[in-house]
Amino acid sequence: MEFVQFHPTLLTQDGKCYGLISEAVRGAGAHLVDEHGRLVMKEVHPMQDLAPRDIVARALTAEYQAGHQIFLDLREVQDFETHFPQITQLIDRHQIPFRQNNLIPVRPGAHFMMGGIATDQTGATSLPGLYAVGEAACTGVHGANRLASNSLLECVVFSHQVAQEIADLPDETKTTTPISQKLADKFTLPDKAALQTRAWAALVIQRSPTEIEEFLTWLAQFDFQSLPAHYSLTELETANLCLVAEAIAQAALARKENLGAHAWRKN
């Protein structure tokens, strides 16, 4: 669960992110620059703008923390609007005047969970009758990082495996006994926005054990594991966010070394 992939280039405007700007734009010749036009990846990695996602995301985060703005410089991209019509529509929708200066404002953001519910090669979990596929599942095919578009192949392969496995089950095994549990009076939940803010601070691209421990201490004051008799969809979503954030934090603390998308902040 500690392996959360951050994409380096999300379209950003006034501190908000609006969508992903594909690495194909850099592959077509775009460069990552700061507000002064400096090539920010030039001294970071031999592959510069085409370095692995985790390396680029960490480098851009360091630039932001140093007070810089980051842009994709499109001057060397041929026929950008023709080759990237959907990205052009996204930029136009948010009224970013990239045609005037050939610059797209970007920043890193959370993108993909390499971890998830542990499954075998058929998509089965440790709970009989429960299957997981796609980003919710941890099939092991991504390891500590993920190559672009491999998640699509994962979904194609494992959805077929899951469907075949379920189809081959005897009819009597296709129903499960409901899980009995004591119902709580109500959830004790944090404000969703506060949870997201604290989780982002503790579980961001480069992490600190102290900040993760502080986050877990804060999270421990809430009871989000006891299902009440009555709850709203928003409450259930927030409770699930708490569970996922707790799992990521605990897994991150257990992983002492830097590996792939999981990296400790240098002191």
Features from the language model and the residues they span:
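FAD/FMN-dependent oxidoreductases across multiple families
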Residues: 85-131
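Short secondary-structure transition/capping segments
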Residues: 10-16, 111-113, 144
